[in-house]
């Protein structure tokens, strides 16, 4: 995933693609945490952005589950 995937980009994805993005983000978060624990992590801000991406994906999945439509502001 890129550094901070936008919610509007995620809304364009299907359910299966969204699950794949979630799986990739969780795997990346695991690897980043491992690097941080061993002192090899250079970009600590990446941890925060990956966690936020995961939260965006979960939020979007919940919105779809509840049938909530979001209105994009201009």
UniProtKB/Swiss-Prot annotation:
UniProt xrefs under Pfam families: Ribosomal_L29
SUPFAM superfamilies linked: Ribosomal protein L29 (L29p)
An annotated GO cellular component: cytosolic large ribosomal subunit
CDD domains noted in UniProt: Ribosomal_L29_HIP
GO molecular function: structural constituent of ribosome
Keywords: Ribonucleoprotein, Ribosomal protein
Gene3D superfamilies, per the entry: 1.10.287.310
InterPro entries reported for this sequence: Ribosomal_protein_uL29, Ribosomal_uL29, Ribosomal_uL29_CS, Ribosomal_uL29_sf
Entry keyword annotation includes Ribosomal protein: yes
The family this protein is said to belong to: Belongs to the universal ribosomal protein uL29 family.
Ribonucleoprotein recorded as keyword: yes
Gene Ontology terms describing biological process: translation
Provenance organism: Streptomyces griseus subsp. griseus (strain JCM 4626 / CBS 651.72 / NBRC 13350 / KCC S-0626 / ISP 5235)
Protein's recorded name: Large ribosomal subunit protein uL29
């Amino acid at each position: 995933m890129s550094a901070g995937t936008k919610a509007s980009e995620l809304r364009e994805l299907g359910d299966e693609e969204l699950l794949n993005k979630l799986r990739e983000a969780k795997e990346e978060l695991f690897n980043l945490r491992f690097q941080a624990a061993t002192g090899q992590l250079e970009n600590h801000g990446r941890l925060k952005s990956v966690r936020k991406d995961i939260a965006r994906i979960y939020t979007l999945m919940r919105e779809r589950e509840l049938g909530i439509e979001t209105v994009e502001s201009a």
